[in-house]
Structures are given as structure tokens and as C-alpha cells.
Amino acid sequence: MEDRVIAGMQSTVSRRDFIRTTAVVAAATAGGLAPGAAEGTDLLGAPGAAGRGTLIDTNVTLSRWPCRRLPLDETSALVARLRSQGVEQAWAGSFDGLLHKDIASVNARLAEECRKNGRGLLMPFGSVNPVLPNWEEELCRCHEEHKMPGIRLHPNYHGYKLDEPAFARLLDIARECGLIVQLVVTMEDERTQHPLMRAPHVNVMPLLALLASRSNIKIVLLNWSRGVSSALVEKLAAVGQIHFDIATLEGVGGVANLLKQVPADRVVLGSHAPFFYLESAVLNLK
């Protein structure tokens, strides 16, 4: 199976090569590996990963989804499932970051939970809400105190748009700190959202203008495929600073179709576990 060619791609890329590329891209984005470090090696996962088949999942979430219990919403159970699927490293946000106003406590709990579980598998990505007072201080705390490699943003739950000055300021600070910015376009299919928790897709169009004047900032779009048109995907891919996860891609040829629009070195594995089944994302690589 490792050498099976993903059908429909414009260039011949084996599953093994694609997994290597997405894993190395994730590691390089996190600053742990130079983009070309895997050339001539068998590295398939996180920096220092031994053996084949290891993966980096850039999209998992800890704690409780507000509307219902999810399978694997206990951190220890999620870690066990990640390991069983060959995941060597997982970038973790917190469901608490959606609605809690005490974001500092949310991030402190997230950092501690990642330290206590997984023996280094979990990398915390803190929540930052630029609508709240002192958000700049919390952003710096994620970087300086918690030593997080990045942050995860939920504009649709926090009530701001990407063309507002606060978001531009957030990008500038994140760039200065060398932080990855994960932008969640949607958390849940709009058809199944709780009536009192309607959250529209984030409009990511403003990224085109924002990134035109901001180089060296790392953006990862999560759960984006239902909220971003094909035409906009091509424009975003042309920017060169944006990476795309595969969590919400649908259909047998979802990954192959994406690779017709986006270079393989900017596509990363993301499962949206435990909200989605981890196995679904892994199967998308086959």
C-alpha cells in the first residue's frame, strides 16, 4: 500500500512520499525541522521519530465539547488512540477556549494537561481572543511562560472578523514571537449546530490582503473545506504562507483533489479528533 499512487494527481506522488511531506511540513512549521531535513531519509513523522509510519496530527482538541460528550474526550484515551494510529506528535487546542472568558486559565490547564499526558506527544496551542481585555498579555504568556509553538483562533465564536484592526495586530505580535497561527474556519457542520450556538464559517478572504504585507508568518487553516470556495483556495495557496489541513475533506478523492490546487508541501494531516474519528483522516492518506 505504501507505494500506491494517489489517483488523479497532476504529478506522481506515492502515499509514502505524501505522508513524509505532510509530516515534515508540520515539523518544519513548528520550527523543529528544516524543510529539507528529510531528504534521503526515512523520516515520516516528528523530529527524532524512529521508524516508519509515524505522523504529525496538527488538529486535535482537549477537554469537553460544550454540547455533548465525545468519544475519547478524556486526554489519556485520546493519547492512546493517537499512538495506536502511529501519531508521533499532536498539536492540541482546548474546547474550553471557545466560550470561556478566563482564557488565561484555559491555556494554563491546556499546558498542564499536555505536560501530564503523552510523554511529549501533545503540543499545546493556546487560545487567544482579541476581543477580550489584555489579550496581548495572554498571547505573550503563551509564548514566554507556556512555551507554546503556536496559537489557535476561533473568530466565529469570539465575535470578530479578520478585517478588524485587532486581528492585524495579533498577526504582527505572533510574527514577532515566531508563533504558528492556526485559524479554525468551522468547528461543526452548520446543519448539526445547536440552535443557541450557531457559528458561521470564518471568512478568510481578508488573509489575502493581510499576508501581502506580512512575510514570515505561519498560518494553518483548520476545518476549512466547507467554508472556503475552490477559487479562494487557489488564491490562498498562491500566497505561500498558508497551510491546509485535511480534516473536513470529503469523498474518496478529497486529498487528491486538494493536491491539484495546493502544493503537497503545504498540506498537513489534521484529524479534528475527538470531534471526528482519527481513523478517517489517516484513511484519507491511503
For each feature predicted by the language model, list its residue ranges.
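Active-site neighborhood of phospho(di)ester-bond hydrolases with catalytic His/Asp-centered motifs
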Residues: 56-58, 91-94, 125-126, 152, ...
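His/Asp/Glu-enriched, well-ordered alpha-helical/loop segment
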Residues: 268-286
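Catalytic pocket-lining loop regions of alpha/beta-barrel enzymes
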Residues: 149-150, 163-268
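N-terminal export leaders
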Residues: 14-35
